[in-house]
Amino acid sequence: MTLRTLRSAMIILALVAVSVLAAPVHSRPYEEIRARGEISVCANPNALPYSSNRPETPGFQIEIARALAGRLGVRLQIEWIVPRMRAALVDCDILMDTIARPGIQPPSIRLSAPYQTGGVALAFAPGQPTVEAYRDLKSGTRVGVMTNSVASMIVSKSGARMVPFGFEDEMLEALAKGEVDAAAVSPASIGYYNLTNPARTVALVHAEDSEPELKWVVAVGLRRADAPLVDAVNAAVAALVADGTIAGIYARYGVDYRRP
């Protein structure tokens, strides 16, 4: 299973945004969800460690959504999103790992309290010296970046030599082989790569901590939710954070839990 996650996540968000804007804007009351006994989540079937249609490794988004549904006392229904599917046909209630920044999401999506910190970290090849911040990258250092990404613009200011990639899994493979010295990659992808490749791990540095544009928090995005549903999801998220459920789920995929 590949880690083509960043582009896949962007596709998911774009599709969901289109479907939200195309669909009639009316609330999905909490009582309606309780009455039907299920809540649905949008997810990509091939985007580990985020989500997968493999029952044995469903991805942390699916596991957290399932735990959330359990707290709400309902079943989880998964609505798989693939690029060829018309987004308007997807009618899910929630979207995990929704970036909680003003102005990014359409008005019809409400956000829960944040439950994880995300961003674009730096990974370093085995044996390579690390730096703590993007600005400390040395001139001539070969740094893998996603094509036309914000991270690529930040790396370009450092004097390092950018090497463009289309997918994170290709970048991490090149990094492990020493074809690049460092890479700007999501911490989740780095952690999962190290978990699944224990013989050739790469070093993770949370360099995004010094770059506001490359660090954010994520929340549950709720489509057309009423206030009682938002309140119920917030209570469920708080409980799953407090009892260690969310941290434990991330750990199963090699991902650091960084509580917002």
Give the residues covered by each predicted segment.
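Bilobed "Venus flytrap"/periplasmic-binding protein-like clamshell domains
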Residues: 40-48, 55-72, 99-102, 121-171, ...
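Periplasmic-binding protein-like
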Residues: 44-45, 116-124, 195-238, 254-260
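Hydrophobic residues within well-ordered alpha-helices
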Residues: 68, 87-91, 137, 175-176, ...
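Extended ligand-binding regions for polar small-molecule ligands
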Residues: 59-71, 128, 135, 141, ...
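A ligand-binding cleft/hinge motif common to bilobed small-molecule-binding domains
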Residues: 85-89, 99-107, 154-157, 181-214
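Bacterial N-terminal signal peptides
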Residues: 9-20
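N-terminal secretory signal peptides that target proteins for export/translocation
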Residues: 1-5
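Extracytoplasmic small-molecule ligand-binding "clamshell" domains
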Residues: 25-99, 103, 107
